[in-house]
Design a protein with these regions (language model features):
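N-terminal Rossmann-like dinucleotide-binding module
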Residues: 2-67
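Short, well-structured alpha-helical segments in soluble
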Residues: 95-103
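Donor/substrate-binding cores of folate-linked one-carbon enzymes
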Residues: 46, 112-221
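N-terminal glycine-rich "phosphate-gripper" loop used for MgATP/nucleotide binding
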Residues: 61-62, 85-86, 90-91, 104-120
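Conserved acidic residues
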Residues: 57, 107, 128
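An anion-binding loop in the catalytic cleft
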Residues: 2-26, 51, 184, 197-224
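Short, surface-exposed acidic-centric catalytic microdomains
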Residues: 52-96
Length: 224
């Protein structure tokens, strides 16, 4: 049995920390990304370092220029382009994604910078088995410009959140969070870079902890 990484980041959900043991068999992950793929890299590195007992079976990306595909190739992970522009609606798009994930026998779906809204087609295929990471302390600052929203609001602390996916954008039970201070001279770029450092820490930790079904149940039950 493999222990999860040390839980040293502030504001980590106690319901997750109490169940921080990984399973006896490697978890089969399917990762979805739209851009740079730095969170994909963090997960792959955590697996290599023995911090996460899992296997990345496939990367699905929707943007032909996504650097995440290059990262997947570097790690020897199959990557499949599913361009949303090729589908008449979101349901058809999600059907193709579900087919790929099922073909690879995926147990958990990790949205690591996935920039598309999902439909019940995907959610129903993997109920309570999809997690997302977002660059704010949800429920504050939802959407694609969370970092800019935090700066505009003048908050002194922001951060990142790992949560179970739901149909509503950037909602669903919160699993793990990490706080990041907002500095007086921060720009969207500098703040986002510091948030990503914490994303790269807590996403592998959350994946590892979620191997406990009790942790999932606790997170769902305690959600307002």
């Amino acid at each position: 049995m493999t222990l999860c990484p040390d839980s040293t980041v502030s504001l980590i959900s106690p319901s997750i920390v109490n169940h921080a043991f990984c399973s006896d068999a490697p978890l089969k992950l399917g990762i979805m990304a739209s851009g740079n793929g730095s969170n994909f890299e963090a997960i792959a590195q955590a697996i290599k370092d023995g911090q996460l007992f899992a296997e990345i079976q496939v990367l699905i990306y929707n943007n032909p220029d996504a650097y995440a595909a290059v990262r997947a190739n570097n790690w020897g992970v199959p990557s499949i382009l599913v361009n949303h522009r090729d589908y008449k609606n979101r349901e058809e798009f999600d059907k193709q994604i579900v087919q790929i994930l099922q073909q690879h026998n995926i147990e958990w779906v990790i949205m690591a910078g996935w920039m598309r809204l999902v439909t019940p087609v995907l959610l129903d295929a993997f109920p309570n088995k999809i997690i997302n990471i977002h660059p704010s302390l949800l429920p504050s600052f939802k959407g694609t410009h969370a970092v800019e929203q935090a700066l505009s609001a003048g908050v002194k602390i922001t951060g990142c959140t790992v949560h179970l996916l739901s149909l509503e954008m950037d909602s669903g039970p919160i699993l793990m969070q990490a706080a990041v201070p907002v500095l007086p001279d921060d720009t969207p770029e500098t703040l986002h870079a510091r948030i990503q450092i914490q994303e790269h820490r807590i996403l592998p930790m959350a994946i590892c902890a979620l191997l406990s079904s009790e942790a999932i149940a606790l997170a769902v039950q305690t959600q307002p």
